[in-house]
């Protein structure tokens, strides 16, 4: 293992450097002041202790903001064991602060793939035996998958899973469809206060920040291609536009494609006539040869494939703000091209072969090895953005824990294994706390107005079908 374990009475942790704890604690205190919804829930439910008895396995980016989430769960009665969901996303000072507080955490920036899985397993195990966990909080679905594949006995006690991101939700839905999902789950990702804040506004803030920190490039006047125009793509396109880039968008969904056009972006395809037939001849080399920066945002596989990588302009920057590194064909790059590390999470990928020639100018600049760029090359979304996402996680954990799925008779369990979105009333509760944090005042409906539009005075205010 590459990280150092520092026993000091409490040893149920592994972080890079426990001496960073004081720095981490100072940043956590600042983050708390920027997370009004999460801190509001902490105050609102502290006396009630709605998570008393909950034992939560957590696998989500081990950042300063996540530290506030962890300590909120504990303040509401839970015990937790934690790891990061990405090998590059841990902020070592945050992990150290959590460990110093006596909370089991296994995470450090720059884990190997083997260390990453080891860290997840250390949360599942305590003293070498499966911990009696009864809740799961996941981001991307790796923890959920490992539990189903290797520790199905743990799932017998689990009341539910709350999933943070698009990729993890896709995996849950695939498991549900295939009949392999063993416990109910809440899709936190599609809560309005998550998807519109984290996915859209968060990426608007953090994408250009990461690129500038990694490259020191001026982005103005250069051409960018954003692959995907869902909420993450929308925020990413805005992030690059506000830097003065000339932004083009590629999409497969006609509705999202229409939105890109209506938002003033040129809709293009990296393939001639939009058709990828698997040959290099189908790649629009004329288009890609002018692109200075390409970013993938889709949660899909090989959306920046080998043919596209070959056709990109010399010295183009390549990055991903989706969850996994398979959006970009990094496997092809490893097999065929030379990698030269410029600094941590910044590589020159030499397209002239496996040999690295420092004088060669035919290279790409790959950020975070194709993994999540905003956490690999910067510090991710700001606290105020993550406030909404993590408040949703807290309410989702409370909701599933109260349902007590694991205590149901066996005959009733199958029909209760679902993947649901957080109830709208809870989504509105998070939004209201966020508005209060901005100093905003929400106007209340009169009884007559509420009756006229067919809602309760206290909400919910929109049907589930409403698109914000």
UniProtKB/Swiss-Prot annotation:
Q: Name one GO biological process term.
A: one-carbon metabolic process
Recall the GO molecular function terms of this protein's record.
adenosylhomocysteinase activity
A single cellular component GO annotation = cytosol
- Cofactor binding description: Binds 1 NAD(+) per subunit.
Localized where? Answer: Cytoplasm
Cytoplasm listed as a keyword: yes
Query: What does the record give as its pathway?
Result: Amino-acid biosynthesis; L-homocysteine biosynthesis; L-homocysteine from S-adenosyl-L-homocysteine: step 1/1
Binding of substrate occurs at 63, 139, 164, 194, 198
Q: What is its EC number?
A: 3.13.2.1
Which SUPFAM superfamilies does the UniProt record give? Answer: Formate/glycerate dehydrogenase catalytic domain-like, NAD(P)-binding Rossmann-fold domains
Q: Where does NAD(+) bind?
A: 165-167, 199, 228-233, 251, 300, 321-323, 374
Q: Which reaction does it catalyse?
A: S-adenosyl-L-homocysteine + H2O = L-homocysteine + adenosine
Q: What does this protein do?
A: May play a key role in the regulation of the intracellular concentration of adenosylhomocysteine.
**PANTHER family, per database record:** ADENOSYLHOMOCYSTEINASE (PTHR23420:SF0)
The entry's family comment says: Belongs to the adenosylhomocysteinase family.
Protein name in UniProt: Adenosylhomocysteinase
Organism annotation: Stutzerimonas stutzeri (strain A1501) (Pseudomonas stutzeri)
The gene name reads ahcY
